[in-house]
Every structure is written in C-alpha cells, then in structure tokens.
Amino acid sequence: MSLTQLQERIEDLECKLAFQEQTIETLNDALTQQQLLLSKMQDQMKYVVGKVKNMDTSTLADPAHETPPPHY
C-alpha cells in the first residue's frame, strides 16, 4: 500500500470517527430527553394512582339503587 493510499484510509477513518461521535452525542441527547420525560410521567402516574386510592367511594352511587338507563 502506498503512502497516499494510507493517508486516504486514515482520512476516511477520521471522517467516520467524527460522524460516529456526532451520532453518539445526538443519541445521548435524545436518551437524556426521554429519561426526563419518563421520570415526569412516572411522577404523574404516582400522583394519579394516589388520587384514585384516596377517592371517597361513599360519594359514588350504589348501582343497585340507580335507575336503569333509558335503553332498558
């Protein structure tokens, strides 16, 4: 292999490395954003579950005492 060919291969590898570094950085940013969103969604889910668990079921009518819907 000639010196020129080796230099071309090195330049090609350097270009590929730069592209891979940029891709990794982009993927890392996307992963970070998704992790933040997931954490926020988990907090919201915990809040909703807590609200549902603390619902006062005494305010709900007993289905046996409700009048049937008009289609019956």
Curated annotation (Swiss-Prot):
Organism: Vibrio cholerae serotype O1 (strain ATCC 39315 / El Tor Inaba N16961)
Pfam families noted in UniProt: SlyX
Annotated protein name in UniProt: Protein SlyX homolog
Family statement drawn from the similarity comment of this UniProt entry: Belongs to the SlyX family.
Gene name of the encoded protein: slyX
UniProt cross-references to NCBIfam families, sorted A to Z: PRK04406.1
Domain of life: Bacteria
HAMAP family (UniProt xref): SlyX
InterPro entries given in the database record: SlyX (IPR007236)
